[in-house]
Amino acid sequence: MAGHSQFKNIMHRKGAQDAKRAKKFNKLAREITVSAKAGLPDPASNPRLRAAIQAARAENMPKDRIERAIKQGTPGADGANYEEVRYEGYGPGGVALIVEALTDNRNRTASEVRTAFTKFGGTLGETNSVSFMFNRIGQVVYPASVADADTVLEAAIEAGADDVQSDEGGHYISTAVDSLGEVRDALETRFGPPESAKLTWQPQNTVPVAAEDAAQSLMKLLDMLDDNDDVQTVLGNFDIPQDLLDKLNG
């Protein structure tokens, strides 16, 4: 089991154990605020804001919390000014990791991310030190319940998508960067709003992590990064065997 759904499953395990709902809402709110500031505070004319709101709704974020986050992104509103930063490095087992963050203090976030990498046997590198191992793509995600794999594949290809991967975790539809909005709109007409629609990083190849100690350290690193308020997403090229993942989750 590799890629997007594997990290999602690891985070689901953690969320079920630790009840990090408030922290998740904080991260979603920050993305909404930054998206509103980056363009117009109207989701109809701001694709990024629209996607951020859809992601928040998919997590059952309260409507008033969403509206408050949008207002904080309007011109003249008080609040912190966040900037987008990306960190790259190697985690346990030699896997490549890309960490995307929204921060109001670059030095603080860099220090905390570096500490997490170092604590669990990883190494934080320079910008572009591992991103060349990934392709920048658009990705639209729907829950598995929206339709069967064949139906989603047919609709996605017709909409102009490049690829679809379906499993018990959902349908992951890949697009060219410039086609994300067009594909999302076509699929939304067919299936309703997606869980998410955003640019992401797709590994060109995966690195197997079969040693239990390395896999455990990697999961702890992912947990620590996810605990950081500034970190929005973590992408990796790891592939942990399903039986080992089940054992560690147990």
Curated annotation (Swiss-Prot):
Region (Disordered): 1-21
Record keywords, A-Z: Cytoplasm, DNA-binding, Transcription, Transcription regulation
Source taxon at top rank: Bacteria
UniProt key word Cytoplasm: yes
One MF term in the entry's GO annotations: DNA binding
InterPro entries: Integrase-like_N, TACO1_YebC-like_2nd/3rd_dom, TACO1_YebC_N, Transcrip_reg_TACO1-like, Transcrip_reg_TACO1-like_dom3, YebC-like
Annotated Gene3D superfamilies: 1.10.10.200, 3.30.70.980
Disulfide bonds: none
One GO CC annotation: cytosol
Signal peptide feature range: none
Coiled coil: none
Pfam families found in the cross-reference section: TACO1_YebC_N (PF20772), Transcrip_reg (PF01709)
Gene Ontology BP annotations: regulation of DNA-templated transcription
Intracellular or extracellular location(s): Cytoplasm
Annotated TM spans: none
Family of this protein: Belongs to the TACO1 family.
Protein name: Probable transcriptional regulatory protein RC1_1808
Protein source organism: Rhodospirillum centenum (strain ATCC 51521 / SW)
Lineage summary: Bacteria, Pseudomonadati, Pseudomonadota, Alphaproteobacteria, Rhodospirillales
